[in-house]
């Protein structure tokens, strides 16, 4: 792991974060999306997309088609291990199936609180309201969650690909075809272009769930 990945935020930032930490805690029972059949007035289903391997337990989330190589990990860590990944789907013939939220099943116990994942560079100088939160941009309309080792392995893999062809990009020359292939293999709750993928970086045991 390089120096940038292990650098902790400044003490001033950490103090501000501690003072507003409870405001940023989610008050919604997110686990209900994976245990109930109806949320609000909408029927929901649960889609299993395999598991994710966290070899270090230092994890990140981002739009994988835009920021996979540059995203900083969360300050919060979890025990290293391999965990199931589930998607809460809102099926709709009228609007198309929508993915409401994602769950990495770290424990079979019911969560007692939800803490917002933070990377340590968020702007905490402005007043934070009860419903405010920090997150990542979804310029390409997708998300992922993975271990920081997966990011490192992907960067090395992609550097080798770029040596062969410097004009390629991750979406058009990798994920586009993989998403379409996965949609053909697992068409439930997917459009033909593909709405989720669980891809392992070649020659590693690190995988990347995309949704």
Sequence positions of predicted segments:
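Intrinsically disordered, low-complexity acidic regions enriched in Pro/Ser/Thr
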Residues: 2-211
């Amino acid at each position: 792991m390089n120096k940038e990945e292990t650098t902790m935020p400044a003490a001033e930032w950490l103090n501000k974060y501690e003072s507003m930490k409870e405001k940023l805690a989610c008050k919604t029972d997110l686990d209900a999306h994976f245990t109930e059949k109806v949320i609000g007035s909408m029927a929901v289903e649960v889609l299993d997309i395999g598991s994710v391997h966290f070899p270090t337990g230092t994890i990140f989330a981002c739009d994988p088609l835009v920021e996979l190589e540059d995203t900083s990990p969360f300050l919060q860590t979890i025990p290293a291990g391999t965990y199931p990944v589930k998607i809460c789907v809102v099926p709709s013939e009228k609007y198309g199936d929508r993915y409401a939220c994602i769950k990495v099943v770290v424990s079979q116990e019911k969560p007692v609180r939800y803490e917002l994942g933070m990377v340590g560079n968020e702007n905490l100088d402005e007043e934070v309201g009860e419903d405010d939160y920090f997150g990542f941009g979804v310029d390409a309309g997708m998300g992922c969650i993975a271990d920081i080792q997966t990011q490192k392995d992907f960067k090395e893999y992609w550097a080798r690909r770029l040596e062969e062809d410097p004009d390629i990009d991750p979406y058009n020359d990798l994920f586009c075809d993989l998403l379409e292939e996965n949609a053909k293999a697992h068409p439930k709750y997917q459009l033909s272009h593909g709405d989720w993928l669980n891809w392992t970086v070649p020659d590693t045991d690190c995988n990347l769930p995309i949704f």
